[in-house]
Amino acid sequence: MELPILPTSIIGSYPKPRWLLRMYNLRELGRLPEEDFREAVRDASVAVLREHERAGIDIPWDGEMGRSEMTEYFTAKIAGFKFYGPIRVWGNAYFNKAAAVSKLEYREPLVLDEFRWVKENTTREIIKVPITGPYTIAEWSFNEYYSSKEELAFDLAKILNKEFKLLEKEGATFIQIDEPAMLNHPDEVSIAVEAINRAVKGVKVKFGLHVCYSNYYLLADYFDDIKVSQFALEAANRNFRDLDYLKKLTHQELGFGVVDVHNPRVESPEEVAKAIRKVMEYIEPERLYINPDCGLKLLDRRIAYQKLVNMVKGVEIVRRELAREGKTSIPFRREV
């Protein structure tokens, strides 16, 4: 499979339509049948896919329309987790933090139905499936059963490995593991690395790893130890400063974040193009994918869409420059 040079993608989440948020509220109040809720999620999924395609995104996803939160969605489907109620994260934001109260077991598919639906309803040949990684789920859960976080993370890796194999069997070609908590504790990074490697073992798809708002110099020390083909990292939020850690990314691909998901200001195409030219001082364009810094769900939907539109326009500016050098496409590589 071939892709245009500098393929564009999203990281995962996208703002939910207001009417879907109302469906979530009605469901929580017990006033919406589950069948109606699922239909609403699927309708929103198709609407978001069309937005991404209209913006020009090469590798889309449905913006996680069926996911209320990036860990709760998964822990609710894994046997051995229990919920005591919502906890406060910041401000007025809450989430249901799960507790591991018995040995974790694979009970049901985690994202298989999502993948099937997106695959059936996109016009794109390649889609990327985002899944929260084993260490982040362990870090963001209470541990009331296992002797250590390491043991908990490794059992989660086994469960994810089963899911990854199911996705491969269904035709998935690109899976992104989201590990925002991976670098929270520098003395535990090796645990996260081993958990990721156990999760991907024996699965022959392209794996990416997304880590955001962290010490990338610490991550860079492990670039060659993590068995993934691509690292999707944010850079716009830090104003593209201090990219020297990329010197250690010698052969893997980089998913480069060029729009800030925490700032409602819409970047211009020229700003995006300038950022891409800067990162090409470190990474050749054949190893570059372009994406937002992180998930877009906290933004107004209109702003999120315009950020994607301008991101693609900025990419097209650089593509025209690269075309003059005869660089127009790259192969879709599952392993690098």
UniProtKB/Swiss-Prot annotation:
Cofactors: Zn(2+)
Residues the record lists as binding Zn(2+): 210, 212, 234, 294
Pfam families per record: Meth_synt_2
Molecular function per GO: 5-methyltetrahydropteroyltriglutamate-homocysteine S-methyltransferase activity; zinc ion binding
The keyword DNA-binding is annotated on this UniProt entry: no
Cofactor note: Binds 1 zinc ion per subunit.
Pathway participation: Amino-acid biosynthesis; L-methionine biosynthesis via de novo pathway
Keyword Amino-acid biosynthesis included in the entry's annotation: yes
UniProt keyword list: Amino-acid biosynthesis, Metal-binding, Methionine biosynthesis, Methyltransferase, Transferase, Zinc
Organism domain of life: Archaea
InterPro entries per UniProt: Met_Synth_C/arc, MetE_arc, UROD/MetE-like_sf
SUPFAM superfamilies per the UniProt record, alphabetical: UROD/MetE-like
Gene3D superfamilies the UniProt entry points to: 3.20.20.210
E.C. code: 2.1.1.-
GO BP terms in the entry: methionine biosynthetic process; methylation
HAMAP family linked to this entry: MetE
NCBIfam families given in the database record: PRK04326.1 (NF003317)
PANTHER family registered for this protein in UniProt: 5-METHYLTETRAHYDROPTEROYLTRIGLUTAMATE--HOMOCYSTEINE METHYLTRANSFERASE
Similarity comment text for this entry: Belongs to the archaeal MetE family.
Task of the protein: Catalyzes the transfer of a methyl group to L-homocysteine resulting in methionine formation. The physiological methyl donor is unknown.
Full protein name: Methionine synthase
Source organism of the structure: Thermococcus kodakarensis (strain ATCC BAA-918 / JCM 12380 / KOD1)
